[in-house]
Amino acid sequence: MKRFLIGALVAGSLFATGAIAESAPNTLGKIKAAKVINVAFASNALPFSFVGTNNEPAGYSIDLCKRVIARIGQAVGQPNLKVNWLAGSTPERLRMVATGKADLECGNTSQTFARLASVDFSGLIFVDAGGIMIRADSSFNSMADLDGKKIAVLKDTTTEARLNAIVQKHLVNTRVVQVGDANEAVAMLESGSVDAYAGDKIKLVGLAAQTKDPAKFALLTEEISFEPYAMALPRGDAALRLEVNRALTQVYLSDEIEAIVGRWLGVLGRPTALLSAMYLLYSIPE
């Protein structure tokens, strides 16, 4: 059977550059003057970024982000830098960074060339794959079985773009249903309003784990996309990007990364060979 039950389980380039703007932003100067850093984050992307205990942001990406924020605080001479957390969807978070409303973005955002037109990115923080979640009691064993069915997907995401390409080429009778919220998609899948939900695999596992009965859901083994996660940054700000990547390198080279992975992704077992290689490749020498 080409799927596995989720209930049995209960994470660009080294220097994403982009074109240099005529007047490069001085985000570090802005943060130093305000003594505040504005950080856009995903409020419902367990286990990467979500609203946790005491209504505070939590997750794998948030832990990395806090290390980055501490490094930025040191760089601007504000070790107790105040953090203003700004929740939003992926398009909203990218817009916040592009317009200057947010100085940094932390979530489960994939780096793409299309997005590099408006923002820069840090080194990679995670690598995932797009997958398909179904109900465990369904008869679907492969993507081909979903021809003529309804698949939910978050609108304006990299998964949506890849899913549409697959549908147009291989599943011409399938209907792609755009949704604005992950919980809405899970509810639609559980009720039978849709037959499947496409998203990043680790996030799908996290969403199922939040339901009353995770064993009701399963993942097809097929992968539909490659998702390289990174932190979105203001475009053209090399000084900020330097501090962000230095902070990430320090975490990757220390025991901290094992603790962070264990805390948020430990239920899935040890990091994959690909993820381990990513930590090594993005550990930039001084």
Mark where each language-model region is.
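Extended ligand-binding regions for polar small-molecule ligands
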Residues: 22, 59, 63-71, 137-140, ...
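Bilobed "Venus flytrap"/periplasmic-binding protein-like clamshell domains
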Residues: 38-47, 57-74, 110, 128-182, ...
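A ligand-binding cleft/hinge motif common to bilobed small-molecule-binding domains
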Residues: 91-92, 106-117, 162-169, 187-225
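Ligand-binding clefts/hinges and TM-proximal coupling segments of bilobed small-molecule sensing domains
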Residues: 22-23, 159-177, 215-217, 248-286
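Acidic, polar ligand-binding/catalytic clefts
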Residues: 66, 77-145, 284
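Periplasmic-binding protein-like
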Residues: 43, 126-137, 201, 208-248, ...
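Extracytoplasmic small-molecule ligand-binding "clamshell" domains
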Residues: 22-105
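Beta->alpha turn/N-cap motifs
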Residues: 41-45, 86-91, 100-112, 136, ...
